[in-house]
Amino acid sequence: MIRSQLKELLDRCFQEGVDNGSWSDRGAGKYTVELPKHEGQGDFSTNIALVLAGIEKRNPRELAGIVAEKLGLETAIVAGVEIAGPGFVNITIQPAVWHGVLAEVFSAGENFGRSQVGAGRKVMVEFVSANPTGPLSIGHGRQAILGDSIARLLEATNHDVFREYYYNNAGRQMRVLGESTRARYLELIGAEFSFPEDGYQGEYIIDIAQSLVDEHGEKLKDEPDVEPFKDQAEKAIFKDISGTLERMGIHFDNYYNERSLYENGHIDSVVQELRDKGLVYEKDDAVWFETTKLGQEKDRVIIKSTGEPTYRLPDIAYHREKFKRNFDWLIDIFGSDHIATVPDVLSGVEALGYDASKVTVLLHQFVTLTRDGKQVKMSTRKANFVTVDELIDVVGEDVLRFFYMLRKADSQLEFDLDLATSQSQDNPVYYVQYAHARLCSILAQSGERGIVPAEVGSSLLQRLQEPEELALLKTLSGFPAAIEGSALDLAPHKFIHYLMEFAGQFHSYYNKHKVITEDLELSQARLCLIQALQLTLQNGLHIIGLTAPKSM
């Protein structure tokens, strides 16, 4: 795109300076071309003079003057150059160059915005990984959309993405689930029962227990083993979770079974390997991981005195199995409640001889629902918390997905139900999707009137000179970079805000200028722009899993 053209131009300018002795070659590749932070500072800005000044020990504005003079000669691309502040060089691009963006959009078509920056790099994204002990909560929902959106953006930048759900079906919480189900089963058949003090509440447990009554009657009344109850509950809850994920448009390439870590001896082998390295000791009938030797503040229990592993041990074993599958990049998406265990797990990975720098852990904050500015708790039959399914029933899949991406992962997310259900321009989802519907409507109207968009390369495109038109072309030009930046930063919120800015610019243009006018040539030029905007916005919505409605 235009930024890369400008970077090539700047590289030539730099090399000319090296060749004629203006500066040394030590600054090669160290300068950047960025969008300016404020309006009125050109279309792009470069720090080349500041970088060279630090290396050459010279005045940055003097060097900026040399750069500006060289760039000013490139009149086919550059319309103007200005030195700003301590030595930034601000560059304004010729309008005709912006018109060339339209050719790039139509040439790439549905692939416009996608790039090869990932170069086929193998990436595993682990997300959701909720225990099969109940329906997905709104907190799980945020993680599900965050993980899926990151995976989609990485795929759009040519990363080979593998989505995995770590299926936590071992340990204490599963036993408690079985005990809770058995208690409800006994209650339903009129037998004596004692509900676990920390048991799982909610109607869903009663529903599972009822299915056992329907299938077995009272035959399980004296069953001493909790396994039949646990297995029935696990199957029912996994089916429920799978249905919720399907509603959200999320699929996984693999569900990794935690129980397999025990059955295949991976837990024991990790303990033995750490023991062989002198990193494990016994104290108070528990097994400790000596993480202080690895730079942590204190040692951690990995096997309790009861013989039950803590979360850290299976997590270390699971990450070892991830590394064995030869991914180039491992991305873990967890709730912020994992913050204490992450350093210990990564220390364990390093201790086992793996490169923990290949692991990126993204922690997200929690979600609160609000109505009329106050936190609310929706009434729920299924559980003692709000489920994702219930939220989808209220706001729909697109709104759910969009709102979950609005904020940085590490920011608390306030989900405003009033805003989410309103059909007004205050609702960001409506605002963006309505922009697409408007674009489609304009194209449909032009078709009915027999007005054909100008062809790419036509001199008619020179009619696109309004400031709002040039601004839209600049935004189109930034579409691939918006995808790439959001993908590599693991930051879907950045792309969402790009789409909101895109929609805002179009709505402003639509309100100020008629696309179809009495001037046929101007109408054709503007329709070419509208066509490119529609295709690009459609691509953007589809890349992050949103629909692009043609009418609203």
Curated annotation (Swiss-Prot):
The keyword ATP-binding applies. It comes from the Bacteria. Its EC number is 6.1.1.19. It is an enzyme of class 6 (ligase). Keywords: Aminoacyl-tRNA synthetase, ATP-binding, Cytoplasm, Ligase, Nucleotide-binding, Protein biosynthesis. It holds the Pfam family Arg_tRNA_synt_N. One of its GO terms (molecular function) is arginine-tRNA ligase activity. A motif ('HIGH' region) lies at residues 130-140. One of its GO terms (cellular component) is cytoplasm. One of its GO terms (biological process) is arginyl-tRNA aminoacylation. It catalyses: tRNA(Arg) + L-arginine + ATP = L-arginyl-tRNA(Arg) + AMP + diphosphate. The keyword Disulfide bond does not apply. Gene3D superfamilies: Arginyl tRNA synthetase N-terminal domain, HUPs, Isoleucyl-tRNA Synthetase, Domain 1. NCBIfam families: argS. Monomer. Belongs to the class-I aminoacyl-tRNA synthetase family. This is Arginine--tRNA ligase.
